[in-house]
Amino acid sequence: MNNGVEVRFFAAARAAAGVDHARFASAPLSSIIADATRENPLLAHVISQCSFLLDSVAVHDKNILVLDGSIIDVLPKFAGG
């Protein structure tokens, strides 16, 4: 039995979210992002600068449908080379 989509926040995204992970219903990535940031303007700002992995694969199309059992990693930009 799957329990929705797990979203894992890292670094500045974790600090802004106040949690290291959250669960959401299956939906397009853009909807999951909207749900995650709806009442958190700081997270909305941070997440706008993040990249996303869906089941360990980089995602560039936020309209992609994220299915139950999937894991999204929210990764802020990192300094360094």
What is the predicted role of each segment?
Residues M1-G80:
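Ubiquitin-like/PB1-type beta-grasp interaction modules and other compact soluble beta-rich domains
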